Amino acid sequence: MADNGNAKPGGGGSGAYTINLDNFSKRLKVFYDHWKEHNSDLWGSSNAIAIATPPPSEDLRYLKSSALDVWLLGYEFPETIIVFMHKQIHFLCSQKKANLIGTLKKAANDAVGADIVLHVKAKNDSGVGLMEDIVRAVCAQSKSDDPIVGHIAKEAPEGKLLEAWADKLSSSSVQLTDITNGFSELFAMKDTSEITCVKKASYLTSSVMKNFVVPKLEKVIDEERKVTHSSLMDETEKAILDPLKVKVKLKAENVDICYPPVFQSGGKFDLKPGASSNDDYLYYDSASVIICAIGARYGNYCSNMARTFLIDATPTQIKAYETLMKAHEAALEALKPGNRMSAVYQAAVDVIEKNAPELLRNLTKSAGTGIGLEFRESGLNLNPKNDRIIKAGMVFNVSLGLHNLQAEKKSEKTKQYSLLLADTCLVPLENLTASCSKLVKDVAYSFNDEDEVLPVKKVEVNAKEALPPTKATLRSDNQEMSKEELRRQHQAELARQKNEETARRLAGVGSGSGDGRGPSRSSNELVAYKNVNDVPYARELVIQVDQKNEAVLLPIYGSMVPFHVSTVKSVTSHQDNRTCTIRIFFNVPGMPFSNDSNLKSQGAIYLKEITFRSKDPRHSSEVVQQIKTLRRQVASRESERAERATLVTQEKLQLTSNRNKPVRLSDVWIRPAFGGRGRKLTGTLESHVNGFRYSTSRADERVDIMYGNVKHAFFQPAEKEMITLLHFHLHNHIMVGNKKTKDVQFYVEVMDVVQTLGGNRRSALDPDEIEEEQRERDRKNRINMDFQNFVNKVNDHWSQPQFKGLDLEFDVPLRELGFHGVPYKASAFIIPTSTCLVELIETPFLVVTLSEIEIVNLERVGFGTKNFDMAIVFKDFKKDVLRIDSIPSTSLDAIKEWLDTTDLKYYESRLNLNWRPILKTIIDDPQKFIDDGGWEFLNMEASDSETEETEESDQGYEPSDAEPESESEDEDSDSESLVESDEDDEDDSEEDSEEEKGKTWEELEREASNADRENGAESDSEEERRRRKVKTFSKSRPPPERSSFKGGPSKKPKFR
C-alpha cells in the first residue's frame, strides 16, 4: 500500500493504516449508483468491472487504477486486483492488505449489499488458481457464458501478477470493454473532502510561486547571476516538499509534486503539459520571456499554475500578453454549471479574434483539462470538440498559451517566444490560485535600455518596483540625453491621460463650489439647573463657582443668577490699589466663533460683559482661577465628545485564542501619547485575529486598531535616525486617549541619550568609547530585528485569504530616494515608499498616498536658485494643496525621475501659484478648464508668445501682478497667502477667543505675529516673509541652503 503516489508503504503491519469507513461507504455507493445509471453509455454495459493496480514505480505517473484505490480506500494498493460485481467484490492481494480490507466487509454490505471476497496470494504463488476462481464467480453471477467485463484498456499490464491476469481474461470466455470514460465522469465531481484537498494543494502552489519563485527570480536578475533552469527546478521542488519554507502550515508527509517544476527561457519553449526544464542558463536580457509552471499535490489531489514573466518587454509583447490574459479571464468566466466544455475554449477564441486576430494561429488547441487525483483528466478536456456539460464540483486546470510568437528583436534567444497562463479553478467560479497575480504590472520586469531613444510604450510596473534604474543598466554613452528624452515623452503621454481622466471625473461630479467644509455640529443645549429650586442657596451675595453643575453664580440686583460656564468667553481680573476688578465676557450671537446653536432666542437681549469690584483680592483671584479651570475642563470634555461623535464605528477586536499566542512587540512607545498626568509608560503591541491592540500597565491606556481601518502600514528601521518605528495611517479617525487621529505610531529609541558627567572628551580609540559604540550598534540591530520579526509575522497573517481584499503589507521607506524639505514649519527628511510619500520622524507626520495625487507642480524652478518648492494637487479639488518648501535644487533631477517612474505627471514653474482660486475656478467651470487644455496651462515649455499671453489670462489659472477683486476682506487676506490653508482661520480664532490655558510657544509666536501685522511691523520669520508675498509673480526667497540630495538612482526595479 502507498498513500503517496506509487511509492512503497512504510514498514510494519496493517495496523499502521486505517481506512475511513464513512468515506468508503459513501463513495462505494456513489460508484455503484453511477455504474447502474450510466452502464450503457459510460460503463460499456459491463456485468463486472476489473481493476488491476501495477507494482510501485519510482516514476511519477497517473493511473486510473491507482486513482480508484486512493478515491475509494484512501491508499494506493500496488499489485492488487479488484473485481466489482453487483453482489460481490473480489480482492486478490497479499495477506497484509487482506487484513486491512477485511475491515470493510460490513460497510460494503450495508452500502451496496455486496459481499467482500478475499483471495490471499502467497508470496511465491503465481495467483493463477485464484484468478480462475474469480473468473468463475463472474460467469456464475452474470448468468451468461460470455459476460462483459469492464477494464482500463490504456493501462498495459505490469509485473507477473498483472500479466497473468491479463492472459487469464483474454483466454477466458469473457468480453472486455473499455470503461475509462466511466471513471473520468466518476472522478469529475468532487465532494467536500476532495475540494478541501484541492484547495490546500492550490494554496501551496500559489504560495510557492509568490513567496519563493518570484523572489528567487528577482534576486537572480537583480544580482545578474547565472542560474540554470534545472537548478531552479530542483530548488522549487524542495520548496514544495517543505511547505514551511513558503510559510504554509501543511504536513510535509501529505505533500508531493505533480510534476518537476518547469522553467523555460531563451527562445526554447514547450507549452505541452509534459514539458521539462533543460540545463540552459536562465535568460533575462531585454525583450526576453520567462515561463514558470509548478504543481503541488496534497492528499494525492493535484493543482497547477503557470505564469509568464516579461523582461523589458516590447509593445508587441505587452499587447500579446494582455490579449492572452483577457482570453484566459474569459475562459475562467465561461466555467459555469450548464455550459458545454467547448464553450470555454470558444470564449477564449472570441477574445483573441476581437483584440488580436493575428494571434489566433498561435493559440493552444485546448484551454486545459479537469484536474484532481489525476493531473490531466482527459475526459474533461476543454477543447472545441468536447460537448460534455460542466457541473458544480468540477475542478479544472485552465491553461491557455500563445506559442511560437515572433519578436521584433532578432537576436538568437529573443526572436521567438511563447506565453503561458494557467490557474486551478473550482466550479462554480473560484480561482484557487489567484493569490499570485498575473497582471502586467505584476509580471513585467522593466527597465529602459538606453541604446534606444525611440518612443517606447511605458510598461506599467508595480509601485514597489517603480524605482529609477541604476547606471549599471544604462549602456549608452549619451545616457543623460536619452534619459531626459524618454522622460519627456512619458510625461507627454501622462499629460494626455491625466487630462482625459480629469475631464471624466469632473464631468461625473459636476460643477460646484465651496470649500468642502460641512456645517459645524450643534452641541447639546447648555443647562446648569433644570429649575429654580435647584439653584443653591447663598448666604452672601458673592461670586460663586458650582463645580458640580458647571455653573457660575453672579449676584445681580440682590439675586444669585446662574450662568453655565460654557457661556463665559473669558474672565480677567485687575487690581488697582486696594480695589480688585473682575470682568467677565460672555458669548453672544453675532460674535466671531460663538456657538449660536446654543443660543435659542436669537432676538433677545444678551449680556455681553459684566464687571464686579471687590476689596478682597484673595477671593477675586481664587474665583477667576476657578472659572478658568472649570471652563477649560468643560471645553476639553465637550471637544473630545464632539470628536468622538464624528468617529466611524469600528468592528470589535477578536482576541487570539489562548492556544495561539498573539504576536507581540514589547516595550514600545506610542504617538500620539496618552493624556493625563503621571509618568509615561511603555506598552505592548499585539496582533490579534482582526486587529492590533496596544496597552500599558494602566487599565485606561489601551488602543485597538482594526486591520480593516489600516490604509497604509510602514516599517522604518533606524538607520540615521534615533528610533525604529511602525506607523499606521488609517482610513478613519480613532481616539488615542483624548486625541482624535488618523496616524498612530509605535516606536523604540535605539540609542539612550546620555551625558558624560566628567565632561572630558574621550579619544576615538578609547576602549570605553569603542565598547559603548559597539553596545549601541548591538542594541540598534537587536531592536531592528525584533521589529522585523514582528512585521514578517503580521505580513504572514495578512496574506491569509480573509484579508486579501484589504491589500495590506508593511511598506519600508526607500531612504536612498529621500530629500529634505519643509512640509509644515520645520525642515524634515521626506522619503518615498512604494505607495506613499512620508515623513514619520517629526510631528506632525506626513503621509501622502500617491494614488490620490492629481499632479505635482515644482515651483520656483530656474537657474540660480538654490532650492525650489513642490505643490501636490490632489484628485479631490476641495482638499487643500500640500506644499513642501525649500527643497534643495540638487534633488530636482532625482525627484523628477522618481515622479516619472511612479507615473505621476509633474510640471515646472518659475513662480509660486495661489492654488485655492485656481481649484475653485476649475470646480466652478470644469468645461472651460477642459476646453483650455486642462493642466497644460502649467506647461513651462510652451512658446514665449504663449507665455506672454498667459500673463493676461484668467487669474484662476495663471499668476497675475494685480490683486483680484474680492468680495470681502477675508478673501483679500486669503489671496495674499502663497499657501491656502486653515492657519489663518486658526490665527483669527486665537485672536478673538482667549484660551485660558498655558499657551505653547507656537501659539505665543502666532499671537505676536498677529500683533506685529496689526501694527504694521515687519516680522523676520521666513513664514511671515512668505505670507507677505504677492499672490503670483513673487520674488524668489532665499531660504537656508539644505544638505544636498543624499539619494540617487536605486537598484533595478524589482521583478514581480
Swiss-Prot record:
UniProt xrefs under InterPro entries: Creatin/AminoP/Spt16_N, Creatinase/aminopeptidase-like, FACT-SPT16_Nlobe, Fact-SPT16_PH, FACT_SPT16_C, FACT_SPT16_M, Pept_M24, PH-like_dom_sf
The organism's place on the tree of life at top rank: Eukaryota
GO cellular component terms listed in the entry, alphabetical order: FACT complex
Coiled coil: 316-336, 768-789
GO molecular function, one term: nucleosome binding
Gene3D superfamilies associated with the record: 2.30.29.150, Creatinase/methionine aminopeptidase superfamily (3.90.230.10), Creatinase/prolidase N-terminal domain (3.40.350.10), FACT complex subunit Spt16p/Cdc68p (2.30.29.210), Pleckstrin-homology domain (PH domain)/Phosphotyrosine-binding domain (PTB) (2.30.29.30)
Alphabetized UniProt keyword annotations: Chromosome, Coiled coil, DNA damage, DNA repair, DNA replication, Nucleus, Transcription, Transcription regulation
Region of interest: Disordered: 467-524, 942-1056
Stretches with biased composition (Basic and acidic residues): 477-504, 996-1016
SUPFAM superfamilies linked: Creatinase/aminopeptidase (SSF55920)
Function: Component of the FACT complex, a general chromatin factor that acts to reorganize nucleosomes. The FACT complex is involved in multiple processes that require DNA as a template such as mRNA elongation, DNA replication and DNA repair. During transcription elongation the FACT complex acts as a histone chaperone that both destabilizes and restores nucleosomal structure.
Protein name: FACT complex subunit SPT16
This protein's encoding gene: SPT16
